[in-house]
Amino acid sequence: MYDYLVVGAGAVGMATAYHIKRLSPSSRVLVVDQHPGVGMGDTAKSAAAFRTIFTSWINRTLAKTSVGFYREVQNSGYDLGMRHVGYLFLVPRENEATMRAVAHELIKAGTPVELYDKMDIPIRTRVSEDEEAREMGLPDVSVALLVKEAGIIDPERLVRYYYEKYVEAGGEVMFGVKVESVKFSPKRPIGIPGEPFPWQDARVAGVETSAGPLEAKNVIFATGAWTEMLMDAAGFGLPIKPRKRQVFVVKASGELGDLLRAGLADREYAPMIILPRGIYVRPEPVEESFWIGVSDRRRYGFEENPEPEEELWRFGIYPVLTKYVPLFEGKTPHNAWAGHYDENVVDYQPIVDRLAEGLYVAAGTSGSGIMKADAVGRIAASLALGLEKAELHGGMVVDSAVLKKTRCFEEERLVI
Amino acid sequence: MYDYLVVGAGAVGMATAYHIKRLSPSSRVLVVDQHPGVGMGDTAKSAAAFRTIFTSWINRTLAKTSVGFYREVQNSGYDLGMRHVGYLFLVPRENEATMRAVAHELIKAGTPVELYDKMDIPIRTRVSEDEEAREMGLPDVSVALLVKEAGIIDPERLVRYYYEKYVEAGGEVMFGVKVESVKFSPKRPIGIPGEPFPWQDARVAGVETSAGPLEAKNVIFATGAWTEMLMDAAGFGLPIKPRKRQVFVVKASGELGDLLRAGLADREYAPMIILPRGIYVRPEPVEESFWIGVSDRRRYGFEENPEPEEELWRFGIYPVLTKYVPLFEGKTPHNAWAGHYDENVVDYQPIVDRLAEGLYVAAGTSGSGIMKADAVGRIAASLALGLEKAELHGGMVVDSAVLKKTRCFEEERLVI
């Protein structure tokens, strides 16, 4: 009988398990994952960038404290592959006024950002002189915002860090075991098969897995894109849906190599570049390449073995990418992969909630799970431990229920 | 080319279409439904009760104005089968304090409710003297609340009323046609197959159906339990999920007949009775019977042809029902049916929102669609017509975006 069973050994699950063990060393904690090791689900398929600068309080709080923790780990000598290359938002005219307002707010608050007027934008785009681009309806870039407290990280090292610390502290793991459902038992059994019935008070008893049942007093689902199907089947409705995501890798050779090494604001490498129409270009210095993706309005749904689609590159990304950054002309990806976002379809923020006695969920990170994993893990651990408050890295304290599904957050204005 | 195409001829869809036509008589409006007539989906499977008394503002506003409209229709001579039999909440001790607080608030506000102390509760229950009930963990009833502005209605007549008025006003309908998907077209076509691509500005062009494409400038999905699968496929995430619901019908013969005719507060028939553990007993005077259901924590999911499950009656309802109302002992349902709720899994309120240019949704009524259909229809019509405000029955004005998916409502405290 485990005290806490965490389903999912991705960034959120491992951070949660680590923080449970840290806060309650004598508890018996188990992490179960269907993969043969940690971080092999969608954590490994992340675009793995981070920033701490957002307009909404909740984004800022989760990302800033998490990234602060990662930085401390990195500075302590455990290399997480963090590089503070920055984010460069290339902003079309239609959004210029909004972006200027956001930038001025940030600058006033002392945030390290830089606003470039059209003529000073450090990445040359040719949309304004290109007739085809105009026919395609692609907007000219009229201003750019460089966000400096931002960069890239290696999610596999991050999750491995949590895993090592967790195991050191006596945490247990079970890999290659798939959790199939959550089990409840009646608080007052009456001895009739089929219990618990709808009218019986019940609490979590454990989970059914591909390797048989596991008993636990508390189960925390940190199951990302798998969350919807597991919780639907258990009768707990969450506004979290899986959505396919794809990343295409282009070698940074020739002039693209120069672009890769053209860091801004004294950084060694190019920033994460956010183009209009949801396309992003992420530097990958170790592999001398760029990772490219797009936030497309794709159907929701889960694919058992998601594969990257050449068509998305060809029709969804390439035509726009090459208009804004002509250096990519003629390039084709030499690698690509696909995974899932676990998207909160209401406010795109994670949900950490208690769904029933002994049943918790920590999911819905909506594409920013890596940069928020530490805070989400601390909140999930505190909630599962029955603490009213969660202490985030750096000492900031939030309500453990801050991410419950019925919360209300302001809308983020600085989005990809 | 239609100006407005409403998908779904249930209560919400027909109310929406009727109000569009009422507010914009010259618009060409079409209602499409897969069934051979109006109200043949989940509208016909509703428990079809109404109340106007809630603790939350939004529940009160939607139900009170809608029921006010139905009452006016009924009083004008168009029989909607409304009977103001009331709702009787039988409250277990664990909820007594909350219910007393709610009741005192309501009484202070001049709401027609009546609170019965244990000895005066007009329905005799025997839980307190029953050892088996105690072993089952069933709580004794310690107080009861009678809500008078409440009762039952015939949803098929209601939807027929809207249908007749809509057709009279020149509205068009297409039955037996299943809408399969929503179609978009690029605002600036470039003439390449596969348009619109993710980076193109697009707007609704119409729908694909089992009978071929239909063109429309605006499409409103009033698709209840079908909403999730249709909108998931279109890439629009909503916190709305289908959940099976079942109603069991028991003949009101012998002493049950006396119970049926034992109206409270001068009403002719028994009230809708809400037992502990989510079981409700609805009088059906026309058929001399009771409709019985339970809000069970059932898995989410859609069934193509949902059937009632004898097991739910036998293990989920009967053991509890007979403990609270022993008159049901030995009774078996002579009829039953199953349908779906379209449940908003966050706040159990309807969502009326604009998802893209020309694309609207009006769904998620979560089991109170009949009693809120008029207000939801007025809000959906106003939003689709581009009006900032919606005028509800009785002259109350709300923002047309009041039910957008990112709203924040207080939690309802008076629930089944």
Region roles according to the model:
Chain A
Residues 1-12, 30:
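Beta1/beta-strand and adjacent pyrophosphate-binding region of the FAD-binding site
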Residues 21-42:
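Glycine-rich FAD pyrophosphate-binding loop
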Residues 5-7, 32, 207, 214-226, ...:
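Short hydrophobic core segments
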Residues 18-23, 50-51, 78-86, 197, ...:
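Active-site substrate-recognition segment that forms the wall
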Residues 94-202:
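Flavin (FAD/FMN) cofactor-binding and adjacent substrate-gating region
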Residues 47-132, 278:
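Dinucleotide-binding Rossmann-like beta1-alpha1 core, especially the glycine-rich loop
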Residues 12, 37, 226:
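Conserved Rossmann-like nucleotide-cofactor binding loop
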Residues 117-127, 311-388, 393-414:
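Flavin (FAD/FMN) cofactor-binding core of flavoprotein oxidoreductases
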